[in-house]
Swiss-Prot record:
Source organism of this protein record: Simian virus 41
Function: Essential cofactor of the RNA polymerase L that plays a central role in the transcription and replication by forming the polymerase complex with RNA polymerase L and recruiting L to the genomic N-RNA template for RNA synthesis. Also plays a central role in the encapsidation of nascent RNA chains by forming the encapsidation complex with the nucleocapsid protein N (N-P complex). Acts as a chaperone for newly synthesized free N protein, so-called N0, allowing encapsidation of nascent RNA chains during replication.
Polar residues composition bias: residue spans: 143-157
Subunit structure: Homotetramer. Interacts (via multimerization domain) with polymerase L; this interaction forms the polymerase L-P complex. Interacts (via N-terminus) with N0 (via Ncore); this interaction allows P to chaperon N0 to avoid N polymerization before encapsidation. Interacts (via C-terminus) with N-RNA template; this interaction positions the polymerase on the template for both transcription and replication.
Transmembrane segments: none
Protein name: Phosphoprotein
Positions with biased composition (Basic and acidic residues): 158-172
Highest taxon in the source lineage: Viruses
Gene3D superfamilies: 1.20.5.300, DNA helicase RuvA subunit, C-terminal domain
Keyword Phosphoprotein: yes
Note on domains (UniProt): The N-terminus consists of a long intrinsically disordered tail. The central part contains the coiled-coil multimerization domain (PMD). Forms a four-stranded coiled coil structure. The C-terminus constitutes the alpha-helical domain that binds to the nucleocapsid (N-RNA complex).
Gene: P/V
Pfam (any one): Paramyx_P_V_C
Annotated keywords: Phosphoprotein, Viral RNA replication
């Protein structure tokens, strides 16, 4: 690692004086509008000629020699005095000002000049004395090997820390002429400044080990925030899963809706066909004729215990009852002889079946065969069988 260059106090002092002389050169000269190279300062007219003239004048002013050191400028205004924070024996009695950074009334438009030997302001107000001294002391401390002025001034107070100053009392100031005195001021300066003492870090050699310490534990509220974020992440994941399930279920619901719609259409078709069949066949729904059912019926004896009521008595039935002496005897009910049912007129039904065969059957051979069967039928059951065969052939 390259060593940092060091400078003596004389070299630093020369650099500071050269800089102050340059600043004084520009501050002591009046500002001329034609020396500015900005186009905003050029009046309307021939712009190129005026700009070239301004550049020529600026080059001539830049070629002038710069004053190597700061000189005292004499003015006709009364002189003001200002004191620094150094040794008070350097100035005459009753001349220091309590705070040199406090503005002093001055005529407007005047510049500032300071005599470093006597510490007096020749004209106007000067606000940068302390700043210039502080910068000079900082340069001396950094680039010189000897002790700085700040260290020498603060060596008297062992409790002094960087950033803090001692409490100083101000005396009544004299402005060097007629006028009201500004009075006295007291500036409160703390012993311990805003920047606390920091121990200097010693340089580490190549052989010395590196000190490693565990990282500080996070604050409790940070842990709580992390836990809250994790909980929110879990809830978001669960919500995403539920949303995916809902989307999958919506597809199934759409398919079910389509199936229900098709089923409704099929049911409506079946209902229409059933209505047509009822209109065409309004007779008995069973294929068994009534006569066959009657043949299957058999007489079965029934014993009724207890008193006999008229509701149990059927006319035309053979009943044996017990009289007062418990003797069996035939009942006194009259037997009703059932008459055979009269034959129905099948002409209308035959005409309906012939018309149905003409409408539903397309082949003429089958149609002629069905019509012959209709004319040959003598019972209603035969006509019903023919009707069913016509409907089956039509489907």
């Amino acid at each position: 690692m390259a060593e940092e260059p060091t400078y003596t106090a004389e070299q630093v002092n020369d650099v500071v004086h050269a800089g102050l002389g340059t600043v004084d050169f520009f501050l002591s000269r009046p500002v001329d509008g034609q020396s500015s190279l900005g186009k905003g300062s050029v009046p309307p007219g021939i712009t190129a000629v005026l700009t070239n003239a301004a550049e020529l004048k600026a080059k001539t002013a830049a070629a002038a020699p710069v004053k190597p050191k700061r000189k005292k400028i004499q003015h006709m205004t009364p002189a003001y005095t200002i004191a620094d924070n150094g040794d008070p024996n350097r100035l005459p009695a009753n001349t220091p000002i309590a705070n040199p950074l406090i503005p002093i009334e001055r005529p407007p438009g005047r510049m500032t000049d300071l005599d470093l030997a006597t510490g007096t302001v020749t004209q106007g107000t000067y606000k940068g004395v302390e700043l210039a001294k502080a910068g000079k002391n900082a340069l001396l401390t950094r680039f010189s090997s000897g002790p700085s002025l700040t260290d020498q001034a603060s060596s008297k107070d062992p409790n002094f820390k960087r950033g803090g100053e001692k409490l100083t009392d101000a005396t009544k100031a004299d402005i060097g002429g007629s006028g009201a005195s500004p009075g006295s001021e007291t500036k409160l300066r703390f012993m311990s400044g805003a920047i606390q003492h920091v121990p200097q870090l010693l340089p580490l050699t190549a052989s010395s080990p590196v000190l490693v310490e565990p990282a500080p534990i996070g604050a409790e509220n940070v842990k709580e925030i992390i836990e809250i974020l994790r909980g929110l992440d879990l809830r978001m994941q669960s919500l995403e899963g539920k949303v995916d399930k809902i989307l999958a279920t919506s597809a199934t619901i759409t398919a079910l809706k389509n199936e229900v719609t098709s089923l409704k259409a099929n049911v409506a078709t079946v209902e229409g066909m059933m209505t047509t069949m009822k209109i065409m066949d309004p007779s008995t729904p069973t294929n068994v004729p009534v006569e066959k059912i009657r043949k299957n019926l058999k007489d079965t004896p029934v014993i009724i215990s207890g008193p006999l009521s008229e509701s149990h008595i059927t006319e035309g039935s053979d009943m044996i009852v017990l009289d007062e002496l418990a003797r069996p005897s035939l009942s006194s009910t009259k037997k009703i002889v059932r008459r055979p049912e009269p034959k129905k007129d099948l002409t209308g039904m035959k005409l309906m079946l012939i018309q149905l065969a003409n409408d539903c059957m397309g082949k003429p051979d089958q149609k002629a065969e069905i019509v012959a069967k209709i004319h040959a039928a003598t019972r209603e059951a035969q006509l019903l069988d023919i009707k069913r065969s016509i409907i089956k052939s039509a489907i």
